[in-house]
Amino acid sequence: MPDDLFLARTFTTQLVPLARAYRRHIDRALAGLALSHSSALAVMLLGRMEDGVRQGLLAEQLGVEGPSVVPLLDQIERAGLAERRPDPTDKRAKTIHLTEAGRALAAQAEERSTQVRAALFADIDKGDLAVATRVLEQVARALDTSDPV
């Protein structure tokens, strides 16, 4: 096997286990907040977004289909972290609004996530991290624009 194909195979083989390991690591860091990684990510994303985003936009940012975000939002809403309201411009759609508790929790989750990333990347050269980020972005673009063989 040519070296470039071996490197590509090695790189892609590591993506899923790395994502799973990172998720487990973040789950442990967020455990004290009594949120799953999915819930914490949704609350953090909502904290970063404009108040009153539509469910569909949150689903898109989470990388899931629209209906898949409903149980997650149910959980977040039951916890008192967010509320859904009818969209004033489209009564069929719902908008999501973080509560005060949701905004506070989003800030805590962001802080813990920042601490985790700082520790994980402390010994990695910034230039190497920039290259790795560019490579991941290029792979993502290639996946979006190419057909499977």
Feature-to-residue mapping (PLM):
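A short acidic, leucine-rich amphipathic alpha-helix
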Residues: 57-59
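N-terminal leader segment of winged-helix/HTH proteins
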Residues: 1-33
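Short helix-capping/hinge SLiMs at alpha-helix to coil transitions
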Residues: 32-33, 47-50
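Charged, amphipathic alpha-helical coiled-coil/dimerization segments
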Residues: 23, 54, 74-134
